[in-house]
A protein has these predicted regions:
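Signature of the SF2 helicase/ATPase Hel1-core->accessory helical subdomain module
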Residues: 1-14
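Repetitive beta-architecture junctions, highlighting loop-to-beta-strand starts
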Residues: 4, 92, 108-110, 203
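Hydrophobic residues at beta-strand termini and immediately following loops
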Residues: 7-10, 115, 166
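ATPase catalytic-site recognition across NTP-hydrolyzing enzymes
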Residues: 15-81
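C-terminal nuclease/phosphodiesterase catalytic domains that cleave nucleic-acid phosphodiester bonds
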Residues: 38, 42-47, 82-89, 95-96, ...
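Catalytic phosphate/metal-binding cores of nucleic-acid and nucleotide-processing enzymes, i.e., regions
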Residues: 72-74, 98-101, 150
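Residues immediately flanking
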Residues: 79-81, 115, 145
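Nucleic-acid-processing active sites and adjacent nucleic-acid-binding tracks
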Residues: 95-143
């Protein structure tokens, strides 16, 4: 059989445009702002996502169309942190979720309130975490006990922020954890607003475990 080498040229790299002489950063950002996340990822970033094999399917998310946030009964902030701010490092991610009841007869539902992802040095991550806590005032803050999550836990607890550490048990990898929550998505209990950050989270979920 023929041997093929796949070459990918995403329009934007971590340090800027792949071809800065032709496409400027601000021009690419304008293009990105006009496109759905799925189309931007496929056509410009060489990262198409497929529904086939996806554990969390796009159509399982319920789009929350109201412009105002529903009355929340509990706010949860979740952190998945990386080690270093370098191009080969994983991203650190902060997501904020709210528990609400769509009507009197329904059970608890979950809405994505905010999502931030980037590569941060620890002082940046600490400042960002404090800003996010002050803005959303979550009742529960969950930080995975790995990488920079451990010193971040220590710093936030010094400021009387109620951090709960999460340590996955052996055999309970990310694939298993996603499978465990998939029924919540499939049953229509997970909502997301019509905003860019939510589109990006939905696409990232749809790409798992292959993305």
């Amino acid at each position: 059989a023929d041997q093929w080498h796949v070459v990918e040229f995403p329009a934007l790299l971590d340090h800027g445009p792949v071809w800065p002489e032709y496409w400027k950063q601000d021009e690419l950002e304008k293009v990105k702002a006009t496109l759905p996340v799925a189309k931007w990822n496929a056509q410009w970033m060489q990262q198409p996502t497929s529904e086939e094999g996806a554990i969390l399917k796009r159509e399982w998310w319920r789009i929350y169309e109201d412009e105002t946030i529903p009355q929340l009964h509990h706010v949860i902030q979740s952190y998945d942190t990386a080690f270093l701010k370098k191009e080969t490092a994983d991203y650190s991610a902060i997501t904020t979720w709210g528990i609400f009841y769509p009507d009197e007869d329904s059970g608890a539902n979950l809405i994505l309130l905010d999502a931030i992802k980037g590569r941060y040095e620890f002082p940046e991550l600490r400042r960002l975490a404090l800003d996010q806590y002050k803005y959303w005032q979550p009742e529960t803050v969950i930080i995975e006990a790995k990488a920079s999550g451990l010193p971040l836990t220590y710093e936030l607890r010094k400021m009387d922020i109620p951090v709960v550490n999460f340590t996955p048990s052996k055999g309970n990898d990310k694939h298993a954890r996603v499978n465990a929550v998939a029924p919540l998505f499939e049953s229509g209990m997970i909502h997301a607003p019509q905003q860019k950050f939510a589109e990006e989270v939905i696409e990232e979920c749809a790409a798992f475990p292959y993305g």
